């Protein structure tokens, strides 16, 4: 074989040998070293073909082209007469990718990053890319304070030019901050400034979730916090001169030093607005008014810019530019703010689209819109639509996107992107207490029936003391104006004695129809009619019950074996709702007030009225709404009319998961006082405490709850992030610590007549409990767990510390 002349060596190991500019004609091309790559594929990637006249430049381009395919580690081009001999060394193919030692970074995240860099099973191994990944991962660990971390790629050769790739992590420990120093501060102490930082060099003993770990991102955020702190207090010349982060020799400790120049405090001398104000100069001037002598405040300046943008956004100017330039006068320590406004083009809405509503029909979402197609874009109207969709409770998230129409200078599409949640639930409840044992309830509720927005519910309870069934249907848009129509049918067979209440049996059934009228965005009124039939029997001689019967013209006897009574009542039902919550379930901001009431109308056997007021206020204490304070109240009052009393079976009760947790359901408040004569269902000497007068039994006190015609319940709740729950499920799980209190009383109780018994007309007998609750929006419906310990209770109260419900939230 003739001596082969070296034309080009590998770009990694040698440089090209230059031949004459005239070159030579290639009559054949041969490859050596190809395994996985086909000859045809290699030839297609080369700029040289058989019959071409090639020179040094052509050979260099050939090598570059072959390297550019990413298939080769080494390329050599040799000449053997008129034949080009291409010697290659293929990059090995990745057969598998594994990880070891990674605790802070999950495997899935690592795989995603590797694939984004082109490193995946079946692809060629690029050692340069692997080295870059090693360095990038180590830089990540350094940014979170793990300076002793290392990442090494271990490549294990396999047959057929394949390799196993294993990334071995040694994460080490997080460096802890030993000290944070601020140099140059005179107006504020270092402790005061550091108290606003996320990073800490000291953690109080009571802060069980705090730590002193260093993170580069947190330091950057703390520096911005420091800058804002000074700018918000008039220090317009404030500057962070430098920041030093020093590492101890063992890489376990960090010292942070921030050098600052405070400067002097400056006052605002005025605000000058210029530019294209789109005819809204008067409104913009109102937003830029300042108080005389007011200190310069960076946050207020930013808010002013945002307010101007929002104002213009309401009039269709979707992309305004607002820029504030402080003009500092060092002589008199004042700042004049020059605000330049460019409203830009006015935009109109071409279409409103919805994405993600696989179940809910478009019409259900579209009827909540306040922004109209064909009208100019109003940012406030778009936001109202988002709020209304959130309040429906059909969606986990609602996001908006304003998209410019290609080719149109003044049109946009508004896109609402929703993520639907399971609006149907199978409701199942269970509770256990030292007094009550186990109780159950069940039902089915669908708040978005077949995507129409109709609410349909079938609920029932079956236990030792109650058989209850209810069918309800509500059309929230009975008319196009948003008037709702709801109806309900129910049946209830209630055995009060088995529920530890005063003994009676009530079999009732009825129906009601309600119309709802929207007043504005946040207020609505309700009005309707109802009918209920009550069949009472087995009524034991109890003071409050007998008092009601006497008011109805009945004269029951304590010796009667079966006191029974029937009523038919027609009621006018009314209500008012104010709802400004930010979402329909698991709210984090806003308030809700709900007033409901009913009064009997002519034709009824009873004459009474009853009113209930529920309030809930959510106050977020951080920008992300992860920490929220919730205050709830429930007030109730009812009484008779025309000399009659409100029926005892309409009484208010408290205790249980929806009122005062830690107490058995419905057991807070007045207890039954019985007439003991010839009572047949209890033994006064054993079950009850009976008073005597002149050797004869008088009245018997019991622990049977009877409720009252007045109720007050309040709760203070602190909602916190749920530990060990990822952000993906944060909107589905809620943890809270609570303090509940409440009382029920009977305003018609005559304490002077029953001086030897508790004063059940006293509203100050307040019960209290505290505990923890967990709520989860599961596929079955909302699950609620609570554990509460009563710490203020009275004789006869029944505790139920642990309570668990499926399908019930508050």
From Swiss-Prot:
Q: Which Pfam families did the record assign?
A: Omp85, POTRA
Give the location in the cell. Answer: Cell outer membrane
Q: Which Gene3D superfamilies match?
A: membrane protein fhac, membrane protein fhac: a member of the omp85/tpsb transporter family
Spell out where the chain crosses the membrane: none
Question: What are the entry keywords?
Answer: Cell outer membrane, Membrane, Repeat, Signal, Transmembrane, Transmembrane beta strand
InterPro entries named in the record: Bac_surfAg_D15, BamA/TamA_POTRA, D15-like, OM_assembly_BamA, POTRA
For this chain, the family text in UniProt reads: Belongs to the BamA family.
* Protein name stated in the entry: Outer membrane protein assembly factor BamA
Q: Which organism is it from?
A: Escherichia coli O1:K1 / APEC
> Which gene is the coding source of this polypeptide chain?
bamA
């Amino acid at each position: 074989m003739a001596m082969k002349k070296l034309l080009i060596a590998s770009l990694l190991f040698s440089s090209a040998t230059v031949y004459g500019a005239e070159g030579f004609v290639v009559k054949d091309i041969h490859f050596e070293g190809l395994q996985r790559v086909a000859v045809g594929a290699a030839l297609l990637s080369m700029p040289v073909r058989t019959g071409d006249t090639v020179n040094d430049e052509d050979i260099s381009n050939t090598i570059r082209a072959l390297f550019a395919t990413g298939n080769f580690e080494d390329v050599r081009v040799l000449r053997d007469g008129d034949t080009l001999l291409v010697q290659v060394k293929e990059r090995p193919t990745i057969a598998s990718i594994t990880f070891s030692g990674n605790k802070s970074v999950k495997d899935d995240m690592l795989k995603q990053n590797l694939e984004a860099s082109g490193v995946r099973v079946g692809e060629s191994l690029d050692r340069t890319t692997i080295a870059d990944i090693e360095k990038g991962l180590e830089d990540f660990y350094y940014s979170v304070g793990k300076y002793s971390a290392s990442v090494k790629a271990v490549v294990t050769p396999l047959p057929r030019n394949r390799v196993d790739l294993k990334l071995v992590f040694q994460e080490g420990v997080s460096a802890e901050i030993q000290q944070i120093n601020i140099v140059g501060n005179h107006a504020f102490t270092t402790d005061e400034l550091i108290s606003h930082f996320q990073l800490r060099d000291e953690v109080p003993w009571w802060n069980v979730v705090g730590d002193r770990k260093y993170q580069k991102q947190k330091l950057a955020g703390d520096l911005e916090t420091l800058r804002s702190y000074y700018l918000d207090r008039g220090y317009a010349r404030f500057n962070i001169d430098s920041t030093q982060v020093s590492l101890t020799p063992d890489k376990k400790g960090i010292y942070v030093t921030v050098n600052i120049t405070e400067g002097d405090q400056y006052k605002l001398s005025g605000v000058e607005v210029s530019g294209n104000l789109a005819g809204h100069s008067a409104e913009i001037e109102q937003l830029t008014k300042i108080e005389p002598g007011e200190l310069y405040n960076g946050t207020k300046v930013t808010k002013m810019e945002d307010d101007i943008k929002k104002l213009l956004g309401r009039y269709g100017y979707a992309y305004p530019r607002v820029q504030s330039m402080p003009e500092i006068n060092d002589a008199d320590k004042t700042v004049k703010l020059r605000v330049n406004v460019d409203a830009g083009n006015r935009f109109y809405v071409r279409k409103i689209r919805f994405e993600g509503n696989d179940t809910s029909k478009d019409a259900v979402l579209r009827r909540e819109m306040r922004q109209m197609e064909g009208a100019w874009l109003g940012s406030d109207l778009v936001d109202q639509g988002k709020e209304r969709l959130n309040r429906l409770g059909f969606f986990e998230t609602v996001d908006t996107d304003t998209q410019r129409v290609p080719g149109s200078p003044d049109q946009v599409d508004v896109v609402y992107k929703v993520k639907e949640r399971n609006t149907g639930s199978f409701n199942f409840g269970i509770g256990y207490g030292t007094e009550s044992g186990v109780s159950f309830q069940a039902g089915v509720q669908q708040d978005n029936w077949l995507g129409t927005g109709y609410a349909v519910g079938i609920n029932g309870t079956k236990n030792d003391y109650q058989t209850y069934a209810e069918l309800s249907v509500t059309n929230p848009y009975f008319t196009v104006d948003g008037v709702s129509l709801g109806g309900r049918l129910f049946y209830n067979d209630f055995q009060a004695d088995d529920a530890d209440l005063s003994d009676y049996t009530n079999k009732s059934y009825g129906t009601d129809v309600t119309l709802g009228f929207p007043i504005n965005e946040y207020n609505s009124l309700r009005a309707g009619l109802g009918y209920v039939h009550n069949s009472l029997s087995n009524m034991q001689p109890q003071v409050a019950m007998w008092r009601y019967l006497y008011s109805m013209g009945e004269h029951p006897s304590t010796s009667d074996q079966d006191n029974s009574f029937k009523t038919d009542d027609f009621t006018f039902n009314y209500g008012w709702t104010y709802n400004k919550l930010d979402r329909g379930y698991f709210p984090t901001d806003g308030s809700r007030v709900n007033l409901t009431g009913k009064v009997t109308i002519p034709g009824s056997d009873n004459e009474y009225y009853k009113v209930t007021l529920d309030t809930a206020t959510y106050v977020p204490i951080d920008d992300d709404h992860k920490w929220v304070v919730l205050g709830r109240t429930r007030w109730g009052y009812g009484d008779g009319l025309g000399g009659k009393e409100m029926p005892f079976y309409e009484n208010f009760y408290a205790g249980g998961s929806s009122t005062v947790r830690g107490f058995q359901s419905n057991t807070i408040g007045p207890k039954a006082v019985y007439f003991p004569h010839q009572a047949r269902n209890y033994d006064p000497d054993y079950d009850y405490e009976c008073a005597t007068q002149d050797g004869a039994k008088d009245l018997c006190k019991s622990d049977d709850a009877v409720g009252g015609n007045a109720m007050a319940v309040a709760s203070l709740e602190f909602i916190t992030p749920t530990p060990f729950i990822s952000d993906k499920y944060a909107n589905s799980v809620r943890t809270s610590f609570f303090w509940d209190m409440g009382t029920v009383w009977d305003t018609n109780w005559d304490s002077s007549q029953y001086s030897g018994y508790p004063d059940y007309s006293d509203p100050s007998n307040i019960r209290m409990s505290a505990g923890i609750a967990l709520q989860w929006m599961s596929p079955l419906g909302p699950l609620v767990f609570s554990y509460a310990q009563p710490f203020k209770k009275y004789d006869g109260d029944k505790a139920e510390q642990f309570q668990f419900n499926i399908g019930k939230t508050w």
